[in-house]
């Protein structure tokens, strides 16, 4: 996104990468993409009792251009999938995605043609959060695991190429569940 992509690979020391990772993980700005009942638990996590501000997430961003984390909470319909992808494409790099709830991760109990059977077919997902709906403590644990992933992410020329390859691999992956039952 900036100067770190212009540096040759191997130029940055690990301590500088660790410092940059600490800065990135301490200032993650989430964008809400609440689509169903999981969004209620996501809003609860942002309230005073759970206090996401101590993790650097003061407020959920209303614009994708100001966010670097998308929390997809709930089922995604086929008509909503292009909108989800457009919002993801508008986010600046580096960007991360948490798939919150079983509906976002695999379609959940909505095993039909109208629901995307896993949001990972639309955008690359970094953390899967199971549950129907997951508790706020589980979302906080997923955020902490994402912080660990951000802390260990590399900088430099190879970072953008690695992100592109990971996105292509995620979008070409086989479905996470098999359509069966009355529909097939």
UniProtKB/Swiss-Prot annotation:
Topology of the protein relative to the lipid bilayer: Peripheral membrane protein
GO biological process terms held by the UniProt record: aerobic respiration; electron transport coupled proton transport
Transmembrane segments: none
InterPro entries: NADH_UbQ_OxRdtase-like_20kDa, NADH_UQ_OxRdtase_20Kd_su
Cofactor binding, per record: Binds 1 [4Fe-4S] cluster.
EC number: 7.1.1.-
UniProtKB keywords: 4Fe-4S, Cell membrane, Iron, Iron-sulfur, Membrane, Metal-binding, NAD, Quinone, Translocase, Transport
Cell location: Cell membrane
Cofactor(s) the protein needs: [4Fe-4S] cluster
Root EC class: translocase
Pfam family, one: Oxidored_q6
The keyword ATP-binding is assigned to this record: no
Predominant location: membrane
Family: Belongs to the complex I 20 kDa subunit family.
Role: NDH-1 shuttles electrons from NADH, via FMN and iron-sulfur (Fe-S) centers, to quinones in the respiratory chain. The immediate electron acceptor for the enzyme in this species is believed to be a menaquinone. Couples the redox reaction to proton translocation (for every two electrons transferred, four hydrogen ions are translocated across the cytoplasmic membrane), and thus conserves the redox energy in a proton gradient.
Subunit structure: NDH-1 is composed of 14 different subunits. Subunits NuoB, C, D, E, F, and G constitute the peripheral sector of the complex.
Name this protein carries in UniProt: NADH-quinone oxidoreductase subunit B 1
